[in-house]
């Protein structure tokens, strides 16, 4: 499986990427929303893992633009935002899953 991780926090990105690669996944990492959108629109992925708070283009807008372009890659939001409203917004914008970070 090929995954896209869009995460600006380098420590979180390294932790997630290392774990996924050890599990046998191929992972591409984008450090901001614009780079993530470019990759999502030009490369095939089995899953996109997207943070909400990103530089250049926020995660919700990225997801909206991906869906507007008829890209059906499943999207998992991985975010420090934990409120019910944040989760509902994410699902309404086109994400398939929402995982709140703790720590």
Q: Where are these predicted regions, by residue range?
A:
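N-terminal/domain-start alpha-helical segments
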Residues: 1-103
């Amino acid at each position: 499986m090929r995954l896209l991780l869009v995460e600006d926090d380098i420590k979180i990105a390294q932790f997630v990427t290392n774990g996924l690669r050890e599990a046998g996944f191929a992972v591409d990492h984008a450090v901001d929303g614009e780079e993530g959108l470019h990759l999502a629109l030009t490369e095939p992925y089995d899953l996109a893992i997207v943070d909400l708070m990103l530089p250049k283009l926020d995660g919700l807008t990225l997801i909206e633009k991906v869906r507007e372009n008829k890209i059906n890659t499943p999207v998992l939001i991985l975010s420090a935002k934990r409120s019910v409203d944040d989760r509902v917004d994410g699902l309404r914008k086109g994400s398939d899953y929402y995982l709140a970070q703790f720590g």
